[in-house]
Amino acid sequence: MRFFAWKENFAKADALIVENRPLPMFLCRVLASRGIKDSASAETFLNCTQPLCDPMELHDMEKAVTIVRRAIDEGKKILVFGDYDCDGITATVLLYEYLEGEGADVCYYIPERLNEGYGLSMKTMEMVISSGIELIITVDNGISAVEEIKRAKEAGIEVVVTDHHALPQQLPPADALVNSAFEENSSPCRYLCGAAMAFKLIAALEQQMQGEDPQDLLLEQYGDLVAIATLADVVPLKGENRILTRLGLEVLAQTERPGLLALAQNAKADLAACNSDTISFMLAPRINVTGRIGSVDTAVQLLLTQNEEQAVALAAEIEKLNAERRRMEENISAEAGELLHRKPALLYNRILTLVGDDWHLGVIGIAAARMLERYRKPCIIISCSNGIARGSARSVEGFSIIDAIAACSERLQKFGGHPMAAGFTLAEEDIPAFTAALEEYAAEHYPIMPVHTVKLDAPIAPEEITVANVEEMSRLSPFGCENPMPTFLLPGVTVQAVNSIGNGNHLRMSVTAGRYTVPMVYFGMPVKQFPFSIGDHIDVACALSINDFNDQRTVSVRVINVHPTGWRQGENLRAAAAFEAVVRGEETADATEVFTRNDLAGVYRYLRDNSPIKTGTDGIYYILRKKLDGYTYFKHLAALQIMRELELMEDMQPEGFVIKNGEKKVELEHSQTFRRLQKG
């Protein structure tokens, strides 16, 4: 079970009810939870009435337009230098396609992730110089390439940087620096992604020629790419990002790009009814995979081609890569699980750090995100090869992983990222010192670590779950970073029925509240792992959508997480923090509970008799606390850890436990955790 946390105060919803255009109260609660304080702001947000910004007002845009237009007119050799993620790929395609259409002498280059790494390098720059390039335009990179751009300038090459990443202390000596990070935090353009910045450059070039704002017309041609990049790069969907994504989704629904049509067909995505999820979970991962484990040029050619047969062939190649990526991810997760079985104390570090040999660098970030979901804490996956270690980190809200890494960076060869995700490189021999420094940093700055939570927008009553209300909720779209699909809490309902669906991988259940019955689906939760029984009282975190089937529209309720009603969340959080401190050998005043042999015996007997246990730590706690007197969350965590250390129990993947027969007698004193608890 994940812990629940409310967003902003949804009780302020009354201020958002517009006299002439009343909104459903539950929608007002969602708006209030997202910091929208008055009716005027609500109308602007819901209707996307804010006009697009003048591209010429962006930092150095006039300089950039002058340089690029002159290069086009004079037939100079132009290089579009991109990045290997979805944002960088689409930005490259967008700008290259435009410049080629303008008759420019243009080519593109995107470095390969594994062999070259991110951004401009000296080796690449020498290649660019020798090829006779006269103008470099970077997209989705360049702002930190100080030495590389200095070398380009020495060789007489003009450089225009378009980027959106954080500004370094020393800026590169480019001829123009067009970066959304230069804009004020209040600017609608502050959080534009790389492809959106490339779009702004195109718009400025067109505006210079036409004398009027061309952005609406340009979006008809490039809006699909801008929307894909914005959602794929997980930039905040506020300001202009919200407008560009909403308009871009409309363009994507009617796109004629053969590559996107072929990609969508393989993903079984209906572009005519596309939404944010279509991009985030179907299209973007497939574009990204070429930069992770394949050749990024496959995706570029897919998006550029006008040949349907070529598009189908390229999309098929990408589909194979995506299947291979899944296999790699599963292998890393399995090896990580084996590592945790051998070293279970790793689970109780403030930052879960797992180290392996030759794990694919294009996949370790995805694996880190999966481990974070399961263990509810920041996670770092490090892959070692030939003495070099490369890590990918994912974090939880409230703990900036990039700040932590930066504070411990003296042993790092390079690093970068943002509060929720980061990457780094170091010598393999420096891993122990680096991870120890991270733990010290976390202990000093976060006595109690933030945990991965389900962010709730507002409570909802069963009678509010109607087609009309959910249709109104669509006005909040597009959904994404800082504007996710609303998560509602349906509190105090009773489990009426639970059935297995999807070959046992998911479940469908019905809950009741008074005279109302609400059917819902819990994806990824097999019935065997579901700890609740008919008649149990539960609180359900859920998302709502419309299901169209046989010309009938009904509300679909998707379960995100479930708590037993009355779940002592705060108490359990404190117990978890106290127990983790015990395992780490730290002194803590909170670890005052007495743990006895009898506590362990009762837990072991139940788990042995019901092994394998196909539910998680919290699920089995819910079951055991009803069977064992005085069974607390602290004792539960202690019992599981002691059984791990004594090799009486093994964690299953993706969740659950298997108990070993235990034919030979074990001594509890052989468990370090048991000994520490006796001292306490």
Model-assigned labels for residue ranges:
Residues 1-2, 477:
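Catalytic domains of riboflavin
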Residues 2, 9-12, 16-134, 155, ...:
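Hydrophobic helix-and-loop "lid/oligomerization" segment in the mid-to-C-terminal part
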Residues 95, 100, 242-285, 289-339, ...:
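Acidic, two-metal ion nucleic-acid-processing modules in DNA metabolism proteins
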Residues 112, 179-181, 383, 563:
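Residues at the C-termini of beta-strands that transition into short coil/loop
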Residues 126-195, 199-212, 221, 238:
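Active-site cavity-forming subdomains of large catalytic enzyme subunits
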Residues 140-144, 359, 363, 542:
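Short, glycine/acidic-rich beta->alpha junctions
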Residues 164-165, 360, 418, 506:
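Histidine-centered active-site/metal-ligand motif
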Residues 196, 365, 369, 540:
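Short alpha-helical basic/polar micro-motif
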